[in-house]
């Protein structure tokens, strides 16, 4: 539980650990955690559809990025966001060079999150706010979990305002900053929405 400091009838959360302390602590845990800048937050497990969608994202991006100097990484790759927060998105793309032992990935250009029944608010509001604050991130893609479709938040350069665009299964995700286009349906190959 984080320490609380009361001042003028307002409670302020004090960090229970620093980002570096969290990164060291998280390595020794059996469960996966993110860090909200104040305390560790347990990450929930996903469904078969969630796993399949993530694999499809990695495959689609890796195939298209091969030889470009950019690469896609999965949910073990951390992103430093606002304050001391650390997020582990379902997929990210970076074109930066960094050591293989890096705990936080620099130069992240695109971030992908697959929604789950419990992550909607965090993915659409909290993480969007955090990812928008990272200058290198140009695209944040939130994929639906009940049907094939996504919302992409993007900015044409590191300083412009963000724009949101919803895409259906029949459309394609254009990522000019990476020089690639991916049909939305490709992210949902072998995903069974019956019962979703």
Question: For each of these PLM feature ranges, what is it?
Answer:
Residues 1-196:
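Gly/Pro/Ser/Thr-rich low-complexity, intrinsically disordered segments predominantly at protein N-termini
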């Amino acid at each position: 539980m984080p320490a609380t400091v009361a001042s003028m009838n307002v409670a302020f959360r004090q960090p229970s650990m620093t980002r570096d302390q969290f990164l060291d602590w998280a390595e020794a845990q059996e469960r996966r955690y993110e860090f909200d800048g104040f305390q560790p937050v347990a990450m929930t497990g996903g469904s078969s559809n969630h796993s399949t969608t993530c694999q499809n994202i990695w495959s689609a991006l890796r195939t298209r990025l091969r030889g470009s100097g950019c690469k896609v990484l999965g949910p073990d790759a951390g992103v430093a966001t606002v304050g001391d927060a650390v997020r582990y998105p379902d997929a990210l793309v970076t074109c930066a060079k960094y050591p293989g032992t890096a705990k936080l990935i620099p130069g992240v250009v695109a971030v992908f999150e697959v929604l789950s029944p419990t992550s909607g608010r965090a993915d659409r509001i909290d993480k969007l706010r955090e990812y928008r604050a990272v200058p290198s991130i140009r695209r944040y893609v939130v994929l639906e979990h009940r049907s094939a479709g996504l919302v992409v938040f993007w900015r044409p350069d590191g300083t412009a305002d963000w724009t949101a665009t919803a895409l259906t299964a029949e459309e394609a995700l254009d990522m000019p900053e990476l020089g690639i286009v991916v049909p939305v349906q490709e992210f949902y190959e072998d995903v069974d929405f019956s019962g979703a």
